[in-house]
Amino acid sequence: NKNQNTDKPNVIFIYADDLGYGDLECYGAKNVQTPNVNRLASEGIRFINAHATAATSTPSRYSMLTGEYAWRKPGTDVAAGNAGMIIRPEQYTMADMFKSSGYATGAFGKWHLGLGDKTAQQDWNAPLSASLGDLGFDYSYIMAATADRVPCVFIENGQVANYDPSAPIEVSYIKNFPGE
């Protein structure tokens, strides 16, 4: 955006599942080449003494975005695909912190922190009742949960991306498919 303050550095925070310390070339990996990540590491900040608050997806993401230990907050274990939004809009997030410092914020990729106000009550055929815009993100293009949990859709700014009303989405973790 040409109206943004360009005196501040860009911040790109990459959060990956199952990526070990020795899996990237910039940390000593020999069997895989990661030239783009190497460049980010050489031109930015490369952490050499960082620790995860949890070993799995949902709780580690929760802690990273809120600054709270997930193990102290009930309901922050690995989220089901139809989980309601675990981080509540009134909670202060990393996105809120960046926005208050004048940054534009965005989230991209795997979310896995729930969407909508309540578990199993999302209407995937309409704008979601609670999404990343409520947590300080100006823009989002995310996968709702994981590739092995329905709905396997991308969500852009609180709505299913490329939604086709002639093919409505129904998600149930209780009802079987016809014929099952």
Regions found by a protein language model. Name each.
Residues N1-E180:
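Formylglycine-dependent sulfatase
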